[in-house]
Amino acid sequence: MLDTLLINIGQLLTMDQEDGLLRREAMNTLPVIENGAVGIENGVITFVGTVEEAKGLQAKEVIDCGGKMVSPGLVDPHTHLVFGGSRENEIALKLQGVPYLEILEKGGGILSTVNATKQASKEELVQKAKFHLDRMLSFGVTTVEAKSGYGLDDETEWKQLEATAQLQKEHPIDLVSTFLGAHAVPKEYKGRSKEFLQWMLDLLPEMKEKQLAEFVDIFCETGVFSVEESKDFLLKAKELGFDVKIHADEIDPLGGAEAAAEIGAASADHLVGASDKGIEMLANSNTVATLLPGTTFYLNKESFARGRKMIDEGVAVALATDFNPGSCPTENIQLIMSIAMLKLKMTPEEVWNAVTVNSSYAINRGEVAGKIRVGRKADLVLWDAYNYAYVPYHYGVSHVNTVWKNGNIAYTRGEQSWSTATI
């Protein structure tokens, strides 16, 4: 007997088409079951089909979804989850057009967050991050990548990674940990970036042994780390058994996209300034282009990543919030979906695939997250919407009704609007 059976699902977005990364037309295709049903047993999906096909199934609880839509839990593959403080005091500077790198040079930007994170205890960081994770869950997210990077020293980086490990045990959202020690060059290492990178590399063997990080990331940008420094750093991390990511071409077209494809990074993120050659190389690789349009929007920039061109050229595109205290302080992945549709010229179908299937592959979770398929974890979202286009169309609010994580209700908005029923 099933534990739970969801019936009368108006649109069941299984996202279950071809295995692997979605490109071109596959990104613009959504497998939808009309009048669908999903069965759950011991936290795992055991039935996917129509209500007609579900007749005869028995369950301890049958939930009538009332014609509303159900999707997989969403995947946010790029966040800076664990940090201290906030940076609302920088809004005025940004409105005046002060460049981020100039704010950074004055001790603001990431350096402000670094100081706040250093001063916070691990428990304070955990409690703050739980608040943000609860919000992410309320927007339908069930899997999140979480970066360190607000320490720029060994003690604080360890503290962030240990906080993430504790959150993995204490919060229902699945977390994927990334070490971003190479997020900026500390003042004391100004002009000695290679020495700083070696210090960060020296931390990796113990980090691997303690399983505190799965990925290693670096901020490849003018005034931070060069393309060659980034490639060398990430290749050494790969030799130690880590998968790698890269903050690439966010501000200047340095060739970060090309570097990511060349070294086989799991993802290249931002890519606002990615060159035509970089896009071509990404299209011919298994590196996911994780686009972060919320950051461009919040920084009030005119030029967004060329998402339309990337998809047309065959790049596997994912979307993420880039949740962080400085350049994108939002947990709302649904807002990111809307911005991507309007500013990156992505279709609703492409947007949905970019926050489920491709985003799961960007963090090596393509075989366990992002699809509704028999045998996978029952990470499901019931939406207060009757078709998938409505969610990115009606922007600025959350359309989530209920979230199931591993078959258990992890979030519901007020009183549940669905009703129990028999089949």
UniProtKB/Swiss-Prot annotation:
Main location per UniProt?
Answer: cytoplasm
Pfam families, sorted: Amidohydro_1
Gene Ontology terms, MF aspect: imidazolonepropionase activity; iron ion binding; zinc ion binding
Q: Name one GO cellular component term.
A: cytoplasm
Q: Where does N-formimidoyl-L-glutamate bind?
A: 150, 324, 326
Q: Which residues bind 4-imidazolone-5-propanoate?
A: 87, 150, 183, 250, 327
- Keywords on record: Cytoplasm, Histidine metabolism, Hydrolase, Iron, Metal-binding, Zinc
Q: How is the cofactor bound?
A: Binds 1 zinc or iron ion per subunit.
| Disulfide feature | none
Q: Cellular location of this protein?
A: Cytoplasm
> Which residues are listed for Fe(3+) binding in this entry?
78, 80, 247, 322
The UniProt record gives the binding positions of Zn(2+) as 78, 80, 247, 322
What reaction does this catalyse?
A: 4-imidazolone-5-propanoate + H2O = N-formimidoyl-L-glutamate
The family note in this entry says: Belongs to the metallo-dependent hydrolases superfamily. HutI family.
Question: Could you tell me what this protein is called?
Answer: Imidazolonepropionase
The taxonomy runs: Bacteria, Bacillati, Bacillota, Bacilli, Bacillales
What would be the name of the gene that encodes this protein?
hutI
